[in-house]
Amino acid sequence: MSQSTSVLRRNGFTFKQFFVAHDRCAMKVGTDGILLGAWAPVAGVKRCLDIGAGSGLLALMLAQRTSDSVIIDAVELESEAAAQAQENINQSPWAERINVHTADIQQWLTQQTVRFDLIISNPPYYQQGVECAIPQREQARYTTTLDHPSLLTCAAECITEEGFFCVVLPEQIGNGFTELALSMGWHLRLRTDVAENEARLPHRVLLAFSPQAGECFSDRLVIRGPDQNYSEAYTALTQAFYLFM
């Protein structure tokens, strides 16, 4: 495509097929989002929803991984982040397939009739505490504008019967999120615990829930091997995206 695959640009992250500027977004491109975007199951999906789209990273990763017929809706409450997501998407190969909506997800859903095969979110997880100096960062970090019960309710309102709702969270918070989801009628179908290396306990967890009951497949992903290079499993998961992998 463009210069994004050949020239490293500032104020963002250069991937193999697209560039994500994030200087106007409270939360930057990071390993959590990259893991989630590469891991979420996309087989057979027709319509995807990204809740809290931020810079547009997840929507772009899903677009790269899916066929040209798949439509992706990216909903972001914060106007500056939504504007930057739109710019990132406009410069990508998939601008015709991704729709950015500057909106509160709860209000936006009241106007929708479509259902989604895949819903994805890298949600806030801090409880309200010391206020951030930047309101946009507080919104991105804390569960004040969309708490976890509300997020699960939103997803339940618009998912298909066999669809998946995927999130990434810190390990302990993910365990609590799972208990909450199960109590609300969701079924855990996929779980990957993520550790920095073999010697460390998992610090992140990737979760996929569905309205439909079924077996839960669980595994563990180690990011770095003994030599501190990326592990074979992490490389296999993310090499379609990282520029120098």
From Swiss-Prot:
What is the designated name of this protein?
tRNA1(Val) (adenine(37)-N6)-methyltransferase
Compartments in which it is found:
Cytoplasm
Biological processes per GO annotation? methylation; tRNA processing
Major site of localization recorded for this protein:
cytoplasm
Q: Does the entry feature the keyword S-adenosyl-L-methionine, yes or no?
A: yes
Which reaction(s) does its UniProt entry say it catalyses? adenosine(37) in tRNA1(Val) + S-adenosyl-L-methionine = N(6)-methyladenosine(37) in tRNA1(Val) + S-adenosyl-L-homocysteine + H(+)
Species lineage: Bacteria, Pseudomonadati, Pseudomonadota, Gammaproteobacteria, Enterobacterales
The record's listing under Gene3D superfamilies reads: Vaccinia Virus protein VP39
Among InterPro entries, the record links this protein to: DNA_methylase_N6_adenine_CS (IPR002052), SAM-dependent_MTases_sf (IPR029063), Small_mtfrase_dom (IPR007848), tRNA_Adenine-N(6)_MTase (IPR050210), tRNA_adenine-N6_MeTrfase (IPR022882)
PROSITE patterns per UniProt: N6_MTASE
Q: Which domain of life is it from?
A: Bacteria
Q: Tell me, in a sentence or two, what this protein's role is.
A: Specifically methylates the adenine in position 37 of tRNA(1)(Val) (anticodon cmo5UAC).
Q: Which SUPFAM superfamilies match?
A: S-adenosyl-L-methionine-dependent methyltransferases
Keyword annotations for this protein?
Answer: Cytoplasm, Methyltransferase, S-adenosyl-L-methionine, Transferase, tRNA processing
Q: Could you name the Gene Ontology cellular component terms for this entry?
A: cytoplasm
- Disulfide bond residue pairs: none
Single Gene Ontology MF annotation: nucleic acid binding
Instruction: State the similarity comment.
Output: Belongs to the methyltransferase superfamily. tRNA (adenine-N(6)-)-methyltransferase family.
